Amino acid sequence: MAIQTSNLGYPRIGLQREWKKTLEAFWSNKIDEEQFLTTMKEIRLQHVKAQQEKGIELIPIGDFTYYDHVLDTAYMLGFIPSRFSEFTSYLDVYFAMARGSKDHVASEMTKWFNTNYHYIVPEYEEGLQISLKDNRPLRLYEEAKQELGIDGKPVILGPYTFLKLAKGYTQEQFATILKQLVAPYVQLLSELHAAGAQIIQVDEPIFASLTKEEVQQAKEIYEAIRKEVPNANLLLQTYFDSVEENYEEIITFPVSSIGLDFVHGKEGNLHAISKYGFPADKTLAVGCIDGRNIWRADLDEVLTLFTTLQKQVQTKDFIVQPSCSLLHTPIDKTEETHLSTELFDALAFANQKLEELVLIHSALTQGTESIHNELETYRNVHHTIRSSAARNREDVKAARTALKEEDFSRPLPFEKRYELQQVALKLPLLPTTTIGSFPQTTEVRQTRKEWRNGVISNEQYEQFIEKETEKWIRYQEEIGLDVLVHGEFERTDMVEYFGERLAGFSFTKNGWVQSYGSRCVKPPVIYGDVAFINGMTIKETVYAQSLTEKVVKGMLTGPVTILNWSFVRNDIPRKEVSYQIALALRHEIELLESSGIRVIQVDEPALREGMPLKEKDWDAYITWAVQSFLLATSSVANETQIHTHMCYSNFEDIVDAIRALDADVISIETSRSHGEFIDTLKHTTYEKGIGLGVYDIHSPRVPSKDEMYKIVEQSLKVCDPKYFWINPDCGLKTRRTEEVIPALEHMVQAAKDARSLLKTNA
């Protein structure tokens, strides 16, 4: 029996975010290309070496990237849109696709399955010459071999998932383009095999949600590849859910190993194995450590899983690995000594998860006695956190038990509410607003850092925040926006800010994970019962409202987004945690309303990303996600206008859910997806307030008035002008002031032009 340890992918960002800092230094011309490439190589090799030192045998090579692994694959295969043809160097093309430039719109960015990581969407164009433009996995494989003497495991994105994630082709073209991918994949795999790669990991996460016909189509591609590369040892890797529905077919694919997720797809994969077994001539790669959360594994449960598998499968060969890439977890917990002992002990970041894999390997190869002490430690840790007072609050349980049906709905239907709101708010046709945040300049960040370090007093910090707030209230008035925001200068992050003010949350010092590009986030840790403590946004919002006669929006992050953008306790259902957060936000919303705030925005940008991969599981998730939003927002008066905001989603999947939220106004990020949501609205109706984002805030370019007007014009063909709002795609926190002001001026002018046209045509 052969058992090996493996990792699917390692966090890219570096222990001190060296990767992020190097990228941003290069983008701002503080370092040249040579220094950039040298530093990135150092970081890349450090990561490979770190995994070897932890005892991992099959170390992933090629999971490292300068921006995004899907973008790497697109560039490698020649999926380069023609609008970037004037760029000649690799890095210029690569980063233009990722970020855009002054004259070039970036490729679309969207969520990687149901995670909080974003990938760059590959674009197919007619006449595209698909070929292996650059065998990057081979270069990195040889680099690790030559520099470190490590014979790694190349990791590539599989052809089927890659093309399914791409856009720009019709469904009728899919099969033809898929066949065109065979040749470059054959070349890629042949060259890796010839260079000595013992095993090559081919990621196909899309396999968790394919139809029978699609699986057969994928199998034909793998058969075509196998025919040309018969001796390459391929590990077909799935993750994020089970492949239960198509398991019987998938285990017949012409590959030597198959990787299954036994954390997020445990029940389905076990059921399939109990029914169909597992081939004796293949290796089973067992994803047994959660690659998406930060809690210590239950080693007893994992060992029981292996006992079950060994009884049910024909193979004697196993790989012990995480459920998915560790990209989604922070690197190491050793710096988190400020946390309580019970919480610190319960955590396992990427490096600790690698140690867990080695422990499991020892137990499987040498017997459980070999890790007796570690097993006892793990059992004690789990008992301590389960029995913690923070996880057993009677007041939280009582509030949940007391909920009634009427707590989940507004008193009047939308049409009647909106009439009352129009009278109260006196807004013009096509009102303009922003999504919430304004630029967090170096001065803002530095002042916050000084306050947190005790260099300046609370009073000095509050005065600074008030000064910034007033400055941006005046900017908004001068620009001519209709509904203003206070700018969120006191907030580091839209989830962290609320977590710091609610019971049940804790925060890491260095628990960073990559969100998109160089943007890293430090998700809160929901370890206990969530409860309201004191007002969280009242002071800043009321102050902003006191500065202007115009309406100022209260700004909150919704319960489902707080849930989906946090590391969440795994001892109770996510639905219950979401309801706890909703009850706390309900209290805050009531306080805002009683303080005179008449428009309150509750952002849910992450509602779509939390959806399960399988359509059969959608309804259950959407039901409690919508109920959570309604629980938070339904206690306000009819005259109070509830807004929400969403971004980066396949909205056609959730139009009904958006409607069910019963928000008076929803703003949706649409500009970067090149009008897809507008197309969705051609085939359905949305009869509530809606704002379709008119410019992409993730790019530094300032769009013209005409660009924005064109989006407004297209939107008004499918949206009722009476209910239509004009806004940017997202918050403006990451942009510079000199980018934001002209862009908003253009947006307001586009709104005025649209109003004039509507009046002329009336």
Swiss-Prot record:
Catalytic activity line of the entry: 5-methyltetrahydropteroyltri-L-glutamate + L-homocysteine = tetrahydropteroyltri-L-glutamate + L-methionine
Domain of life: Bacteria
Name of this chain's protein: 5-methyltetrahydropteroyltriglutamate--homocysteine methyltransferase
CC cofactor note: Binds 1 zinc ion per subunit.
Pfam families in the record: Meth_synt_1, Meth_synt_2
Positions contributing to L-methionine binding: I435, G436, S437, E488, D603
E.C. code: 2.1.1.14
Active site (record annotation): H698 (proton donor)
GO biological process: methionine biosynthetic process; methylation
NCBIfam families listed in its UniProt record: met_syn_B12ind, PRK05222.1
Stored InterPro entries: Cbl-indep_Met_Synth_N (IPR013215), Cobalamin-indep_Met_synthase (IPR006276), Met_Synth_C/arc (IPR002629), UROD/MetE-like_sf (IPR038071)
Enzyme class, broadest EC rank: transferase
Keywords from the named record: Amino-acid biosynthesis, Metal-binding, Methionine biosynthesis, Methyltransferase, Repeat, Transferase, Zinc
Stored Gene3D superfamilies: 3.20.20.210
Record: residues binding Zn(2+): H645, C647, E669, C730
Metabolic or biological pathway, per its Swiss-Prot or TrEMBL entry: Amino-acid biosynthesis; L-methionine biosynthesis via de novo pathway; L-methionine from L-homocysteine (MetE route): step 1/1
Cofactors (names): Zn(2+)
Binding site for 5-methyltetrahydropteroyltri-L-glutamate: R17, E18, W19, K20, K111, R519, C520, W565, E609
